[in-house]
């Protein structure tokens, strides 16, 4: 009997070894402009023709340099000319202009297929890309003109064919810069099909003294199976959209009392704008009633033509915000907001709030860095100071240990919005940018950084309804780390984006010397790992249609090593005939006696 038990343990250990994490290096690239600011990783996406597109912003400043460097050398366009960003004349060497950079790459080799960039206009705080059915993509971003405040070209994009496409905007004429949103369609060959303003805002003078240069934030982007485009964010003034027939539709923000005209204050209303395939307004969704301080939708994903958004909202404990039949009453912290929305008519399936709390009675913060749809669940990742609870009377399910920010993970059921688990790093200053599910149903990898130290993966384990950070860590890149971009999970592949300072540091699995940067730089790296659990909702690659397997609530039984023992729909069915022992049933540890 003892021999059989020992043999069983050996077999379980062997199975566990099969699922052990082994992230294998495939390739990497380094990217930077010669500026002391800027050089920002944004996201990696997979196009419907099976390639990758890396979206970054590179810096330019005539005092330090305007060229773009790729793998340590000046990058050239299709005609062999060295690429240069906007000729921004900085007031000092510490400033810079952020230029758009889109690069389509072969996923196996990392070889660049084409490059699209901008040489006029400054990509400001928010920018996104999303794949389209033809193998191309849509770009949306907040754009500001720093090079010349009187110039009418807000953004100029240079396609892979060398053709330049301009988006024009008439400045206010008051010597101040203005920010507006730009949307553009890039085809599969890197040609700019079209580019234009998403809408226009009024830029009012606030309280008689401050010019409102930044009236709307375009934060999230998605495209449905019909090619319609969805943009989310928040706005502080009147915003005017144009419809296909040339008529205009104006929406006025309600929550403007807290706005002082600068980017430093939090104010305004959340929105989702539905546009047709050419960028004309079809429908606009915002709250029905509100008197809170501010609310915003920060991130957006879409699955099977259902939109999911995550955001934040702040009130005073008595003020309310109403969406349809749901009324929320946020306190004076940054509370976490998330919703499920029908793409067809922008009506709500649900909208929910997780209540934030302060550390030490005064410090609070929530930053949404990513929103993932993954095997029927939503993962919200980012940074937090303070705590989160399910409602105003519940005990917090996560809380920081200091006033400094820590990595945060919240998992909810995408179907009904029920919060499933939450996790926190436990140390500052850290951040989370993505979750990777594994073949062990009770563990996940969390991608994030330890500030000024490394980009990394940390193993979290589900224990008693919480995701707890363990000791297992994989340092993907050891360097003076400042931020990350949204990574890509592609089957068993993981493509990471990091922003180290001074040089590219030590990259896991890479050989050769590090790339020296002028200051900040970008590192794009691909790994593969058999421990990664792919998303069930695999793309067909045809017209961007996703096929989802039937999902039902289950009580499937696994060993602790993650080996499936039996499938079951109920607990009674799961435990019937099951030998005594410890199992994972329905995602929870269960002792069967």
Residue ranges and their predicted role:
Residues 3-4, 13, 302, 373, ...:
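N-terminal leader/targeting segments
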Residues 21-538:
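A sequence-level/structural motif corresponding to short, flexible coil/turn segments enriched
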Residues 539-593:
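C-terminal outer-membrane/trafficking sorting elements
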Residues 17-18, 337, 573:
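Hydrophobic alpha-helical segments
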Residues 10-19:
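Hydrophobic h-region of N-terminal signal peptides that target proteins for export
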Residues 1-5, 593:
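Positively charged n-region of N-terminal signal peptides that target proteins for export
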């Amino acid at each position: 009997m003892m021999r059989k038990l020992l043999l069983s343990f050996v077999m379980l250990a062997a199975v566990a070894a099969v699922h052990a994490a082994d992230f294998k290096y495939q390739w990497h690239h380094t990217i930077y402009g010669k500026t002391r600011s800027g050089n920002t990783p944004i996201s990696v996406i997979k196009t419907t023709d099976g390639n990758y597109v890396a979206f970054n912003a590179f810096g330019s400043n005539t005092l330090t340099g305007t060229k773009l460097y790729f793998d340590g050398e000046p990058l050239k366009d299709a005609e062999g000319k060295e690429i240069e960003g906007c000729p921004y004349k900085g007031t000092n060497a510490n400033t810079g202009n952020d230029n758009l950079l889109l690069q389509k790459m072969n996923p196996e080799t990392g070889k660049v297929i084409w490059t699209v960039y901008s040489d006029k206009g400054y990509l400001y705080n928010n920018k996104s890309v999303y794949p389209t059915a033809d193998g191309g993509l849509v770009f949306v971003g907040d754009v500001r003109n720093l090079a010349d405040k009187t110039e009418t070209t807000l953004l100029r994009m240079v396609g892979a064919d060398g053709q330049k496409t301009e988006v024009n905007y008439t400045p206010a004429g008051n010597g101040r810069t203005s920010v507006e949103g730009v949307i553009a369609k890039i085809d599969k060959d890197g040609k700019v099909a079209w580019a234009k303003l998403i809408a226009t805002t009024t830029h009012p003078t606030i309280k008689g003294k401050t010019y409102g240069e930044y009236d709307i934030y375009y934060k999230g982007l998605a495209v449905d199976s019909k090619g319609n485009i969805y943009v989310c964010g928040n706005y502080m003034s009147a915003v005017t959209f144009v419809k296909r027939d040339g008529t205009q539709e104006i929406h006025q923000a309600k929550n403007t009392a807290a706005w002082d005209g600068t980017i430093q204050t939090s104010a305004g209303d959340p929105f989702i704008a539905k546009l047709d395939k050419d960028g004309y307004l079809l429908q606009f969704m915002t709250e029905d009633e509100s008197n809170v301080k501010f609310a915003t939708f920060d991130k957006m994903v879409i699955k099977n033509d259902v939109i999911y958004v995550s955001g934040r909202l702040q009130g005073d404990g008595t003020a309310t915000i109403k969406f349809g039949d749901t009324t929320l009453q946020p306190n004076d912290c940054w509370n976490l907001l998330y919703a499920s929305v029908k793409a067809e008519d922008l009506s709500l399936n649900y909208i929910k709030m997780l209540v934030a709390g302060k550390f030490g009675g005064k410090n609070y913060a929530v930053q949404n860095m990513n929103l993932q749809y993954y095997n029927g669940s939503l993962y919200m990742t980012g940074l937090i100071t303070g705590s989160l609870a399910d409602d105003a009377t519940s005990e917090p399910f996560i809380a920081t240990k200091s006033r400094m920010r820590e990595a945060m993970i919240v998992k909810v059921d995408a179907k009904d919005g029920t919060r499933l688990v939450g996790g926190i790093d436990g140390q500052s200053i850290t951040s989370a940018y993505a979750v990777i599910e594994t073949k062990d149903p009770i563990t996940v990898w969390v991608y994030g950084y330890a500030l000024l130290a490394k980009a990394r993966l940390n193993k979290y384990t589900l224990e008693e309804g919480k995701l707890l950070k363990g000791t297992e860590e994989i340092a993907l890149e050891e360097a003076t780390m400042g931020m990350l971009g949204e990574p890509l999970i592609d089957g068993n592949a993981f493509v990471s984006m990091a922003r180290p300072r001074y040089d590219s540091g030590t990259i896991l699995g890479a050989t050769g010397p590090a790339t020296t940067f002028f200051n900040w730089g970008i590192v794009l790296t691909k790994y593969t790992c058999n421990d990664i659990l792919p998303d069930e909702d695999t793309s067909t690659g045809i017209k961007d249609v996703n096929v989802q397997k039937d999902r039902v609530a289950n009580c499937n039984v696994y060993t602790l090593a993650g080996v499936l023992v039996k499938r079951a729909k109920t607990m009674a069915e799961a435990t019937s005939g099951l030998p005594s022992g410890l199992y994972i049933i329905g995602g929870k540890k269960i002792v069967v006696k």
